Amino acid sequence: VILHGILGSGANWARFSRDLALLHPTWGVMAVDLRLHGRSSSGSPPDRLESCVEDVLALASQLGYRVEAAIGHSFGSKIALQLGTSVESIRHVISIDADPGPVDLTGIDREQVPVLRLIDGIRRIQKTGFSTRREFDQFLESSGFGEAVAGWVGKNLVRSDGRWQFQLDIDRVEAMLLDQHHFDAWPLVQSSSCERISFCIGGKSKVVSEASRNRLEDLQVQQPGRIRVEIFEGAGHWVHIDAADDLLQFVSERMLD
């Protein structure tokens, strides 16, 4: 199962999922839309990581799937870690450019945090929407976001009454994000309840702090085989876009380990 980041969707991972399935035809690959995202329903509050875990398990049960690996990008990584340390059938967890520790934003202006700035921008224009997709792209550009973010967030736009609009409960989405910020996944990483945990980090990304990188590398030495840290030097936060082939090769080989 592949779990996207906040304000993303399973469609962000469509190419990667297809390529992984082509490499391993006997594997089933499921790139989900998390609650409040993409084509998924809103689900019932509370909007916490635990609720997302329950949603994924309910979907897998409904489809009759046995989940054996969880891949999570950014926000999705802590869901993947919770799945991997609570579901016996899951042998592999792969965290993509996400810090396992809590994120402390105390005293930091929201404008200085890109994802919060993006949420605030969507909140401002949510009622009016956009006449064209190009207008949406220009809005993001004026807010300091590039083409990659437009492609990622734009998967949540729907056509309604002649305009492109976000059908998002942005306050609930932010509640999910803040719960993820508060959650400390280090105890899950250091436990022995998941057989293999890998951390794929964009070399140009600042999401995983230097202290966390050092801690992960120490764990890799202490628990060889179980913990693996892989730095994708040319990649930023969107490793699956910036280093698509290298990430695909790593995931493919690691899950055969």
PLM segments and residue spans:
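Conserved serine/cysteine hydrolase catalytic core
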Residues: 161-224, 228-231
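Catalytic histidine-centered segment of alpha/beta-hydrolase-like enzymes
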Residues: 232-248
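Active-site loop/oxyanion-hole signature of alpha/beta-hydrolase fold enzymes
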Residues: 14, 21-71, 75, 106, ...
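Conserved alpha/beta-hydrolase catalytic His-Asp/Glu region
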Residues: 127-179
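Flexible "cap/lid" loop of the alpha/beta hydrolase fold
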Residues: 81-85, 89-130
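Active-site glycine-rich loops that stabilize anionic/oxyanionic intermediates
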Residues: 5-11, 74
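Alpha/beta-hydrolase active-site loop signature
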Residues: 7, 34-38, 100, 236-239
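Structural cue for short, hydrophobic secondary-structure segments
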Residues: 2-5, 31
